[in-house]
Amino acid sequence: MGRIEERFGVKLASLQDLFDVLNRSHDYFAARNCVASDHGIEIPLRGDYEYADADKVFRKAMAGEALTNDEMNCYMGAFLTECARLNSETGWVTQLHLGAVRDVRKSLFDSMGPDVGGDISNHYLDYAGALCSFLNRFDDKLKVVLYCLDQGHQATLATISRAFGSKVALGSAWWLCDTPIGMRRQLEYIGAVDTLMNFAGMVSDSRKLLSYGSRFEMFRRVLSDVVGDMVGRGQMPEEIALNIVRSIAYDGTKKFWNF
């Protein structure tokens, strides 16, 4: 928070002060044609927080006092909800990458710092309650893309996407699932529960710029293979299959992301 105060020339005495800075930052990127924000959160966060409660937590943390898990979730939920509110006003897409537990190997973190291979996935997460609370707060007012690490959660996210309609989409297979096998399994499953057209398409947040072409090429080949198999089994007419592939690979994705 000290770096934020220095960068923006403000004193963060309340949660609203932080929200004001967030608004300024959001305006800066919006003026430069940003169309999405990406949020990595270990557990889904509710959208029904009370500002007064979150403000108390913020002031407590700024005073150097320790926070409970519930207090941290209250603050993080408030911050994410404010980000989503700003996104809904400007038409940005809100990406939620769910379930990654960061830096679990202490010796690796101590010697090399964060994000160097010490992250894992967490299967024991309750997606439905908190996530539905968040989505209900912005029902039909916010484009959201949901990503999960554990394929066991695909059923929950696919049915949530279907329940909330076209503005809540499923993201492409992520991280350890971002392989031909992982992509195929995901596409086959979401096709089976009738959400294939409610798919956000391939989006890469990779730091490896030179891999962009190969990653998108691999996804399109897997997509064509999966849909082609469905045509071969008589599950889908060829004309519809071509429209689906075209939409996921380009047309629908371009429209969803406001490109």
What does each model-identified segment do?
Residues G2-K143, G152-V168, R185-G201, M218-S224, ...:
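Histidine/acidic residue-rich metal-binding segments in metalloenzymes
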Residues D53-V57, A130, G182, I240, ...:
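Exposed alpha-helical structural elements
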Residues V144-L146, L242:
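Beta-strand segments within the central parallel beta-sheet cores of soluble alpha/beta enzyme folds
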Residues Y147-Q154, W175-M183:
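Acidic-and-aromatic substrate-binding clefts and catalytic sites of carbohydrate-active enzymes
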Residues G171-W175, M183-I190, I240:
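Glycine-rich flexible loops
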Residues L196-M197, S214-F259:
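Mid-to-C-terminal alpha-helical segments outside catalytic/metal-binding sites
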Residues D205:
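Intrinsically disordered, low-complexity polar regions and short flexible loop motifs
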Residues L209-Y212:
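Short active-site-adjacent structural elements
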